[in-house]
Structures are given as C-alpha cells and as structure tokens.
C-alpha cells in the first residue's frame, strides 16, 4: 500500500478516516439526506441511494437551506454522519452543521476545503485520513500499490 498526502484548509477541526464518497453535484442535507440512515434520498441526485455514514464525503459544495445544518447534526446524533467532509467551495451550512454536531454530540467530523486540482486524486484513493487543526488540514491518501 502506498500513502501520499495533500494539504488543505481546515474549516472544522477534527480527525476522521474512511473510503471516499465523491458526489458529482452539491447535496442539500435538508431533504436530500435521510438523517436516520445516512442515505442520499434526493431523487434527482446522481449518487441517490449512496450511504454517507463513515465515509470521507467529497462534494463540490453544499446546497440548500440553512436547515441543512440541523439535518447534518441529526445524522451525527444518530451515528450515521460522514467521517469527514471535503469541499471545493466554502459552505457555511456544512460548517455550522459539523460544529453543532461537535458541540452537542461530540462528533469530531473534520471539514476541509481542498484545491480543485487535488479532487480527482483524492476521489481515486482507497481510503482518506483527515486531520484538521487550526487552519491546516492534512489528508493522507491510501491506495493499493
């Protein structure tokens, strides 16, 4: 197994690891994710029926209403939140949801902003391990050698 690393901007501190789940389009957690199961339920989303639980969730940006923060926090409360969230564009709704989940439920889901040129390489990894502290996030990519 080979390991590489990518640096990113930390938006929410924490550490998490999981297989990457790359979403081709932004996802609204309010109405697009079942917080009880972690299932993507948006019937128009290309990754409908994917499970976010325990995954390194990669999405270009969030989409939707401010209620998405509550839906994301609820998924963490019920134990089906992602292990980490990687974005290309800043999204305050995603950040607030992860911060609320950390404060209320002790969920340490890091959220990081990655550079678009790193996106494909991250998505192709077998597993991603994210550690976010301060403003710096380090993402270790594990791939089969």
Predicted regions and their residues:
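Short, low-complexity, intrinsically disordered N-terminal peptides in bacterial proteins
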Residues: 1-7, 142-145
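Feature captures the catalytic cores and cofactor-binding loops of soluble hydro-lyases/lyases
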Residues: 4-12, 21-132
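Phosphate/diphosphate-binding glycine-rich loops and adjacent basic-rich segments that engage nucleotide
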Residues: 133-145
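Internal active-site segments that recognize and position negatively charged phosphoryl groups
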Residues: 17
């Amino acid at each position: 197994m080979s390991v590489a690393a990518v640096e990113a901007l930390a938006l929410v501190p924490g550490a998490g690891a999981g297989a990457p789940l790359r979403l081709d389009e932004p996802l609204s957690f309010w109405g697009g994710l079942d917080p009880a199961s972690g299932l993507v339920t948006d019937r128009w989303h290309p990754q409908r029926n994917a499970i976010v639980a325990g995954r390194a969730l990669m999405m270009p940006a969030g989409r939707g209403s401010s209620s998405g923060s509550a839906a994301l926090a609820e998924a963490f409360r019920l134990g089906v939140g992602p292990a980490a969230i990687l974005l290309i564009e800043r999204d305050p709704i995603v950040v607030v949801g992860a911060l609320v989940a950390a404060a209320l439920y002790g969920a340490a889901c890091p959220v990081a902003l990655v550079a678009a040129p790193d996106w494909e390489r991250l998505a192709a990894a077998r597993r991603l391990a994210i550690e976010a502290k301060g403003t710096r996030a380090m993402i270790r990519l594990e791939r089969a050698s």
